[in-house]
Design a protein with these regions (language model features):
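Contiguous segments within soluble domain cores/interaction surfaces
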Residues: 26-47, 52, 58-59, 63-103, ...
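Internal, hydrophobic beta-strand segments that form the core of beta-sheet-rich folds
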Residues: 67-68, 88, 125-133, 347
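Ligand-binding face of N-terminal immunoglobulin V-set domains in extracellular IgSF glycoproteins
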Residues: 111-115
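Bacterial Sec-dependent N-terminal signal peptides
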Residues: 1-32, 390
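Short, surface-exposed beta-strand/strand-loop-strand elements in extracellular ectodomains
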Residues: 225-227
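Short beta-strand and strand-turn-strand segments in soluble, beta-rich domains
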Residues: 44-48, 88-99, 229-232, 313-318, ...
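Surface-exposed, low-complexity/disordered segments
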Residues: 40-44, 55, 59, 80, ...
Length: 668
């Protein structure tokens, strides 16, 4: 339906451009670019993953349960592309300590992660989810969620004491995560980032510049911002929602200073991005509840030049047109009811088809068909049943998790609606995303616009989608479960081409599977497996000319994305005053008058107190026990997985000390 709509718009604007007599060169590039966008989405559609969890924080020893939804963005529906979902548990330092695969059926999957002995210390752990196909794009494309994992309570059931370890370099723990945003200019007390609207400052043209002010930990700051040239203040502004704000600035080629002063009196100076002598400036007004207004101006040397623009949502063309630049620029209005809800993107291109400016804006959704209502009751009491009335679209499924609001841990309140409509199209962590979808009024529209300007990462790269930049597809789309990789020579006399492989898999229940394959001219192979669950052991054999021949068999399974930087707001704990765990006494009346046999009812047993602990008869055996050692450790290295990765790459196996020194510089 969306493709048909795009084609109709395409033909419509063809005749509009022709009748208006606008630049035929710009129109020709518009025609080519819209066609390239359609082709890109047809052959390389993107996916989004959302995980719905049962809680907002966990204790060591518990289990993280989740329901996964995989969405195809070009059709805004559950995906029919990928069949395998990867879910990872990542330590605060960025080590992936657990990776599981789950079968995606009709765009959905479900599963769990056990917080067992692999979780050595409490801390803020990250759960990531992605399909292999998604790793062809930036690591910002994948799903990511940070959870506090607390120490196991000393008294079972007492969750009021939540103890969590702080990540400290005094403990000589390495950090494999990305550093903070490279665009951020870090100083002692104040960090400031500046974003010209549309992407560039142009001399002689007034631009809107968004800014984001925070402290060295990433916490938002209230501050005043001054633009100073020489000894004169030419403009000033101040922060608004969450340390963000706007200023209007007209560069003239002379250097200016930016002075930022916070509420405590601390101040620092910064520089704005360099201005261009020639170019375009885009200004977008989103405050009208009915429409979005775009105004494009250019430097005088570009008067008479043709430009074209494309409005897209999820990479799909919604509107397109051309214009000829003049002294007054060009203005276009886009009606909100003709645009899709969520994050939309305006891309401006010159008469040669190059992207010269772009801008994100948010369109508030008004269609809310999913509702959950709690039946009215005189009072809510512990262990009392509550009736829920739920409404959703027909022929759909949904998941539901219920928890005590007073036991919320890190204040995380995002749902699938905020993820799909907002945060999955933006860069980094979005604090309180539900705020932007709360009301469609001037205050919320302005806050959402500030968010678009400072965290507007481009999930859909229009330079790439229009053919201006090459897309490299490194990983395949897994429409089934595959084993693929490459053979590496052990002896040079044995070529890796046309080698027969046979694989045998077996599990603890005694089931077996077998498969065969042949390598290509470069030694690559792939074998398709039927769906299977739990752990399986695989044995692989290689034959050359029907004789067993030794090769190093590499498996392509190391495509885990780069670990991102964890935002300050993701590691904040909501205080809890008291425990909210209740037990029904044995003689308390049931809420239901329906007779339930004794063996079908739940029974509250008396608390059992442990008076003694087992003492090892052989102390050395206890000391050498791996599980006992892991319990007292601060770092965990899965040497077996590391050895597999080295073998898969065809590299020589290093000595343990050399490997540790490379893995962790503190071992040097």
């Amino acid at each position: 339906m969306k493709t048909k709509r795009s084609l109709i718009l395409y033909l419509f604007f063809f005749f509009v451009s022709f009748l208006n007599g606008q630049s035929q060169t710009a129109f020709q590039h518009l025609k080519e670019n819209v066609g390239n966008i359609l082709a890109f989405n047809k052959y390389l559609p993107q996916e989004k993953v959302y995980l719905h969890f049962d809680n907002t924080g966990y204790f060591k020893g518990e289990t993280i349960w989740f329901k996964a939804y995989v969405v195809r963005t070009d059709k805004s529906c559950l995906s029919d592309l990928s069949h395998v979902l990867y879910v990872e548990l990542v330590t605060p330092g960025g080590d992936v300590i657990d990776t599981k695969k789950f079968c995606i059926k009709d765009g959905e999957a479900d599963g769990y992660l056990k917080l067992d002995d692999k979780v050595l210390e409490s801390g803020f752990y990250e759960v990531r989810a992605y399909t292999r196909y998604m790793t062809n794009w930036d690591n910002e494309c994948i799903f990511s969620r940070v959870f506090p994992i607390f120490k196991k309570p000393n008294k079972e059931g007492d969750y009021s004491k939540r103890v969590i370890a702080e990540h400290s370099y005094v403990q000589r723990l390495p950090d494999y995560r990305e550093s903070a945003d490279t665009l951020k200019v870090k100083v002692k007390k104040i960090n400031a980032r500046f974003y010209p609207e549309g992407g560039n400052l142009v001399q002689g043209l007034t631009s809107t510049v968004a800014f984001d002010i925070c402290d060295e930990d990433g916490a938002h700051l209230a501050a005043d911002v001054y633009v100073i040239k020489g000894t004169d203040t030419i403009t000033r502004s101040k922060t608004e929602y969450q340390g963000r704000g706007l200023l209007r600035y007209t560069p003239d080629g002379e250097a200016c200073r930016i002075l930022v002063t916070d509420s405590s009196g601390h101040h620092r100076e910064f520089s704005l991005p360099e201005s261009l002598q020639s170019g375009y400036v885009m200004t977008v007004n989103t405050q009208n509840p009915k429409s979005v207004l775009m105004h494009v101006n250019s430097s005088p040397d570009l008067y008479g030049k043709g430009v074209c623009w494309v409005v897209t949502h999820n990479g799909i063309t919604e509107s397109a047109d051309t214009a000829t630049m003049g002294a007054d620029g060009t203005i276009r209005q886009f009606m909100r009811d003709q645009l899709e809800p969520g994050v939309n993107q305006i891309t401006l291109m010159d008469d040669e088809g190059h992207v010269v400016a772009d801008r994100l804006f948010f369109n508030y959704p008004h269609d809310q068909s999913d509702t959950i209502n709690i039946a009215s009751s005189t009072a809510l009491s512990p262990c009392k049943k509550v009736s829920l009335d739920m409404k959703s679209l027909s022929h759909t499924s949904f998941s539901l998790s219920i928890r005590d609001v007073e036991t919320e841990t890190n204040g995380y309140n995002q749902d699938i609606r905020t993820w799909l409509l907002l945060t999955s199209d933006l860069k980094g962590f979005i604090e309180n995303p539900e705020y932007y979808l709360g009301e469609d009024d001037a205050l919320h529209r302005h806050a959402a616009d500030l968010l678009m300007l400072v965290q507007g990462w481009r999930r859909y790269d229009m330079t790439m989608m229009t053919g201006g930049k090459k897309f490299v597809k490194r990983e395949p789309l897994e429409d089934a479960l595959y084993i693929d990789g490459r053979l590496h020579q052990v002896k040079k006399k044995n070529p890796v081409s046309q080698v027969s492989l046979s694989a045998t898999l077996y599990n603890a229940q005694g089931y077996t599977m077998t498969g065969n394959g042949v390598t290509d001219a470069n030694g690559y192979y792939a074998m398709k497996l039927p769906d299977c669950e739990d752990e399986w052991t695989m044995l692989m054999y290689t034959k050359k000319n029907n004789e067993l021949t030794k090769y190093n068999i590499g498996i392509d399974r190391h495509f885990s994305p780069q670990r991102r930087h964890i935002n300050y707001a993701e590691t904040q704990i909501t205080p809890i005053d008291k425990s909210n765990l209740f037990f029904r006494s044995g003689d308390e009346a049931s809420d239901s008058s329906v007779f339930v046999p004794m063996d079908k009812r739940n029974h509250v047993l008396k608390e059992v107190k442990v008076k003694g602990h087992h003492i090892f008869e052989n102390a050395r055996a206890g000391w050498e026990n791996e599980r006992n050692g892991a319990y007292r450790s601060s770092m965990y290295y899965n040497c077996a997985d590391a050895a597999d990765e080295i073998a898969d790459k065809g590299e020589d196996m290093p000595e343990i000390h050399d490997w540790l020194s490379k893995r962790n510089p503190f071992f040097e």
